[in-house]
Amino acid sequence: MIDDLRIKNLRSILDSGKIELKPIMILLGSNSSGKSTFLRSFPLFTQSVDKKLRGPISWFDTSYVDYGDFKTAKNRYAEDEEGISFEYSYYNLRFMDTRRFYVRKGNYVYPTELKKGTFSFELK
């Protein structure tokens, strides 16, 4: 499960800063401020993990989202040597114990291993 993310130099987002993800979120902002770009970053990663890749992301596969070419997708205020970068912090539930434990208020399934990690990469 993704805990937080940061996007840099993608379309109108110069640097989103660290955005902590919650079960319910409201995105507010003026037109062209990056709301849709932020939301479209999730399908971008979905199309990347759905296939075996040589690189970290499936930029040119348009199954879920299409940002166009790199030059168009890069923020116009970004420095020439900077690329588009993504950083995700996540909790990795590697094993789920599916045995049922009977407690007064019901049955529970609990994670037996919970790890926090960070995944980041830059496209240039």
Predicted regions span which residues?
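P-loop NTPase switch/coupling surface
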Residues: M1-K124
